[in-house]
Amino acid sequence: MATPANQREARNLNRVFAAATLCASLALGACGDLGRFQTASSPGFAPVKPNKPAAQTPATEREHSRILSSYGGSYDDPRLEALITKTVDRLVAASERPDLTYKVTILNSGAVNAFALPTGQLYVTRGLIALASDTSELSSVLAHEMAHVLAKHAAIREDQAKQAAVVTRVVADMGNDPDMNALALAKTKLTMASFSRAQEFEADGIGVGISARAKFDPFGASRFLTAMERTAALTANRAPADPRSLDFLSSHPATPERVQNAQANARQYSSPEAGERDRDAYLSAIDNLVYGEDPSEGFVRGRRFLHPKLGFTFQVPDGFVLENTAQAVVGVREGGTQAMRFDVVRVPAEQSLGDYLNSGWMENVDKASTEDVTINGFPSATATASGDQWQFRIYALRFGSDVYRFIFAAKKKTPESDRSFRETVNSFRRLTLAEIQAARPLRIKIVTVQPGDTIESLASRMQGVDRPVDRFRVLNGFDSRSTVKPRDRVKIVVD
């Protein structure tokens, strides 16, 4: 959760909690853009002639700053940066434009994501780096993003978006037949989705070819896609909805198809095991890498949220899944019948919290329900509100110079739901000095398998993660049939 900042308040209640539910259900696996990383060439799409990346402009500088702000800033690790630089140099030399220059920024985020700006600025999150098991897997991601730059996909997509916007305005101006208008708008959206998919397929073909010519194992792409799919499955199993069901306009094929296409594409260049994986060097480079959330921005441990920098903590009831985002901490209860949002706002010191709750930032607040309360010594106020599908309980709590909001929603308000909401708010307290000093990030630790070790025994050493055996398999690229043997090197997560 970001530190306090002025922000425009959401006025639509359903929109507020639709966003909260979406963020919580996606969690780690879908915060990484599964659709963006494809690895197969697609028949029927003519390749775009590679071009030089666009020059740096004030707009791209602003975009770079926005990306850093959204992803926790940059992550500095000289050893890891050296490995990435060496990898990119090999890829550039093997690309269609070896004269171009790329700069890679490691983002301080546990999300699994990678993307590129037209200028050749590439971004990878440390969450993606932690998930990859060798240099060839990372190279497949970097080559894919380089391909987007070479093919000038961002500029082409912008042109397509402008055309789609014109169509949308024309349809809206016609306005005579609602059914026809809806159909036309849907077709426009599907056309855009199909166009994005075409770009992804083109980047797949270019990227796998670059990796193969750089002598990396081109099958690293399919292995990494499999790891992403398994990560998403872990997330879906603990969240209230399957992330893939949340976007019906997604044009990307199911992950098994992506993996199959990646394998078919790689076979054009190499047989399995022929290219370089560079696993040992990669594991050495990521040893001690921060895993998951950065404590400086707050972090989730089970049902607790702790923010050592701001000095507070709270805990949600059993059955809630918490997710810390850049804007707020959001949570959803199993089954999706209850949701919550926790964030920070600026409220003038002279304005009472009760007046703030009734100031119009949320619609349909029952003013008669407003009451002043004290929570663990902190002045607070609470009220109820109602929407079409949700019933709300809201709190404002003054902590130092800032005001924190708890916004709870239930599809059906019951004494039990109201009690669980109150329990959450009443758990808000200051962290002790000892708790602040003990708040350390989780880290990737590389260990050597000893005689007698098993996947289960190694996974039992994992700390701070759910489903440790499954998480261990995903982190190390293992499936249900995999085993370990002495002297193997594997990743575990430790505190």
Where are the language model's segments positioned?
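A Zn2+-metalloprotease active-site environment signal
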Residues: 2-4, 12-18, 28-314, 321, ...
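Surface-exposed aromatic
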Residues: 104, 112, 122-123, 244, ...
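Surface-exposed amphipathic alpha-helical segments
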Residues: 139, 322, 406-443
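Residue-level marker of beta-strand positions
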Residues: 313, 319-321, 454, 489
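Signature of long, low-cysteine stretches enriched in small and polar/charged residues
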Residues: 341, 357-405
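Primarily a LysM-type cell-wall glycan-binding module
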Residues: 433-466, 488
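Extracellular LysM carbohydrate-binding repeats and other cell-envelope/extracellular binding modules
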Residues: 468-495
